[in-house]
Structures are given as structure tokens and as C-alpha cells.
Amino acid sequence: MTPRTITVDTVRFGNHLPMTLIAGPCVIEGLEFALRTAEALKQICEGVGVELVYKSSFDKANRTSEGSFRGPGMEAGLRILERVRREVGVPVITDVHEADQCVAVAEVVDMLQTPAFLCRQTDFIQAAARPGKPVNIKKGQFLAPQDMARVAAKAAATGNENILLCERGFSFGYQNLVVDMRGLSIMAQSGYPVIFDATHSVQQPGALGGASGGDRRFVSDLARAAVAVGVAGVFMEVHPDPDHAPCDGPNMLPMAHLSPLLDQLKALDRIRKEAMALESGLSLGDA
């Protein structure tokens, strides 16, 4: 199928286009922290020459324990994301967890994201798509990649075809995820842009007892492999000090490691997209 181009503010996503980065800390930790991390990420991406969509969550509704840090909540979180968008000048994405959040969130952000655990919930997926903003639909850790075409069809039935499909690992026994890179190519057959979540793919759900663990040593390896297969973008949660982050620290990438990794990913992406262009007859960057 001909690859689609999805525009998020001024940023274009397409499996045939230069890769885009979706990045930011797991959860909103306050206004100043959000502005500071967004500005730092913007400068890194501008230096490398990669487009950025800033990501952070106002609520982590699927934490391992009742007492786990969840974030500032929707109202306060959206105010912060609006400030980031306006003052830093980057498009923003955040996740929704309930159908009745979608309209309010879509009024502030440039793209919505749906959690992997909820990808089979038809009413929820359609509620996320109905406002018309682009939606990054995460594939469930239990779902075959070919099944994501039907998930996308549910969203598109609302009239919104601004859909991206995101791989974030597959459950492999208890408290472990693996990535089958074939799934990226299988999902790309839908025509929708495919995003690879390099940090949640190294998560170890519930492995720390009251919290999820992870192994960030493998983030770079998986990101390079995914880009070599060919994706529209890479999703990475990035933090200046992940060992002291309130959630998902073990699988977040230290911000100091981002620039050299992006240099590598950009080079790999260029090689892969040039090959794809030759195979399809498109010029790199064509819509």
C-alpha cells in the first residue's frame, strides 16, 4: 500500500520520509522542568537535524502500585503542555486514558496517544480519533502486528485517518518484553506511519515489586535495529537524571546520550529511506 503522510502541526510522519523523534520525560514533573527539558530536546534535535514532537504524560493511569506517582492530573498537565507548545515552539503529544478526556486534550495538544493496554477497546479508540487530531495508537503487548490494521480501521471509521501505529514490545514470559522487528514491516503494510517505542520496549513490567523495572542498556540497540528496518519515527522517553525520575526511570534514556544516538539513527535512516525510494520510485522527502 502507498505510504501515507501524516502532518502533526508542521512535522510530517511517513514510512518513506526522514525519521521524526517523539521524546520527553515519562511524566510531567512541573512547569519549569517541562519547559527546560522541552527546550533542551529542541536544541538537540535542531543540532542533529531531526524533527521533534515533545511527549509527556499528565497522568500515568496504569502504574504498578496504588501509591506510585501518577503526575499532576489532566487540568494542570494540559496547562503545562500548552505553555510548552507556545513558549518552546514544539508540537506536543500526550496520552489519554478515558474516552471523556479526548475532546479536552485534543483542544490543547497536536497529537493524542492511546495506551497499549487499551488498543482493543473500540469505543475508546474511536473517542480518541473523533476530535480529528492525529492519534498514535500503541500496539498491545499481547497483539499480533497484523491485527493493528483492524485497530486502525476502527479509528478511521470516525472519518479521521490521521493515524500512526506504535510498536512497544511483546510480552515474553513474566515481566519481560521482546521486539519482533518483522512487526514493523507488517504494520507498515497498512500504509500508516509506524513508530518504534525504544524505551518501553526495554521495560520489565512489575519487576521491581511495587514498580516496573527496565534495562536502558538496550535502548540504543533496539532503536538502531528499528530504523534499519524502516520506520516513520522513534519514540523515546528521555530524562536528564532518569535514576531519580518519579517513574519509568530504569528504561528512560539519559538526555546526555541522545545527541550521539540521533546522529547514528539519522545516518541509518538516510540509508534505509534511500533504498526504499529506489524500490518504490519515490524521491526521498516526496509526499
From Swiss-Prot:
<dbReference type="GO" id="GO:0005737">
    <property type="term" value="C:cytoplasm"/>
</dbReference>
<keyword id="KW-0963">Cytoplasm</keyword>
<keyword id="KW-0808">Transferase</keyword>
<comment type="pathway">
    <text>Bacterial outer membrane biogenesis; lipopolysaccharide biosynthesis.</text>
</comment>
<protein>
    <recommendedName>
        <fullName>2-dehydro-3-deoxyphosphooctonate aldolase</fullName>
        <ecNumber>2.5.1.55</ecNumber>
    </recommendedName>
</protein>
<comment type="similarity">
    <text>Belongs to the KdsA family.</text>
</comment>
<dbReference type="GO" id="GO:0008676">
    <property type="term" value="F:3-deoxy-8-phosphooctulonate synthase activity"/>
</dbReference>
<dbReference type="Pfam" id="PF00793">
    <property type="entry name" value="DAHP_synth_1"/>
</dbReference>
<dbReference type="InterPro" id="IPR013785">
    <property type="entry name" value="Aldolase_TIM"/>
</dbReference>
<keyword id="KW-0448">Lipopolysaccharide biosynthesis</keyword>
<dbReference type="InterPro" id="IPR006218">
    <property type="entry name" value="DAHP1/KDSA"/>
</dbReference>
<comment type="pathway">
    <text>Carbohydrate biosynthesis; 3-deoxy-D-manno-octulosonate biosynthesis; 3-deoxy-D-manno-octulosonate from D-ribulose 5-phosphate: step 2/3.</text>
</comment>
<dbReference type="GO" id="GO:0019294">
    <property type="term" value="P:keto-3-deoxy-D-manno-octulosonic acid biosynthetic process"/>
</dbReference>
<dbReference type="InterPro" id="IPR006269">
    <property type="entry name" value="KDO8P_synthase"/>
</dbReference>
